[in-house]
Amino acid sequence: MGSKINPIGFRLGVNRDWEAKWYAARGYKETLNEDLRIRKFLDEKLKDASVSTVEIERAANRVNIAIHTARPGMVIGKGGAEVEALNKEINALTNKQVHINIVEIKKPDLEAKLVADGIARQLEARIAFRRASRQAAQRSMRAGAKGIKVQIAGRLNGADIARREWHTEGSVPLHTLRADIDYAWVNAFTTYGEIGVKVWINRGEILPGRKNQPAKRSKGGKK
């Protein structure tokens, strides 16, 4: 089953955390739809800002949003103008107090979402799919990845019949729960139709910390 299930959902609670952290006793549907509107708005507004992950936390009437991006300057803007504008627009969208935190991604070549976005943009620019996937995989391996797997599916090179092509380097153990596997899928819109890009990146193993050992009890009894 490790090969079929979403590897991020498979590892939730093990070495991955939820991207939305809130609890709603009532109005769950409205809160979830509000989350989806926020994510859709940020996807459209920051499509060129190399955003990998958006985390949303809620407390009372406050919404905390953490934007993980490889281009923090583009999101923040000159003197913080862009992030202030984002804050106001999301505030108007939700009617809640919004706080935005920008988190810089140090190694974008180890983020599956950014790698998949890069491959999709190259496919839309009519670059050969094998070249795009091979170069992306090589950059990820040079950045420190233990393994990477890329799947591209659709009418590749304008072929009449859609097919699926893979490129794999290193090791990507989908069944190993302690393996830090990042996963993303993106659609590329070409003149021949829609092409799907999926990327799995193995960033190594996350070993659980040792739990505190209980103090050893001394044996009772008289000497």
Swiss-Prot record:
Domain of life: Bacteria
Gene3D superfamilies noted in UniProt: 3.30.300.20, Ribosomal protein S3, C-terminal domain
Keywords linked to the UniProt accession: Ribonucleoprotein, Ribosomal protein, RNA-binding, rRNA-binding
Classification via SMART domains: KH
GO cellular component terms given for this protein: cytosolic small ribosomal subunit
Family matches, as Pfam families: KH_2, Ribosomal_S3_C
SUPFAM superfamilies hit by this protein: Prokaryotic type KH domain (KH-domain type II), Ribosomal protein S3 C-terminal domain
UniProt record, GO biological process: translation
CDD domains: KH-II_30S_S3
GO molecular function, one term: rRNA binding
InterPro entries membership: KH_dom (IPR004087), KH_dom-like_a/b (IPR015946), KH_dom_type_2 (IPR004044), KH_sf_prok-type (IPR009019), Ribosomal_S3_C_sf (IPR036419), Ribosomal_uS3_bac-typ (IPR005704), Ribosomal_uS3_C (IPR001351), Ribosomal_uS3_CS (IPR018280)
Ranges for domain KH type-2: 38-106
Record keyword RNA-binding present: yes
RNA-binding found in the keyword field: yes
Described function: Binds the lower part of the 30S subunit head. Binds mRNA in the 70S ribosome, positioning it for translation.
Family: Belongs to the universal ribosomal protein uS3 family.
Quaternary structure and partners: Part of the 30S ribosomal subunit. Forms a tight complex with proteins S10 and S14.
Protein name: Small ribosomal subunit protein uS3
Organism (species): Lactobacillus delbrueckii subsp. bulgaricus (strain ATCC 11842 / DSM 20081 / BCRC 10696 / JCM 1002 / NBRC 13953 / NCIMB 11778 / NCTC 12712 / WDCM 00102 / Lb 14)
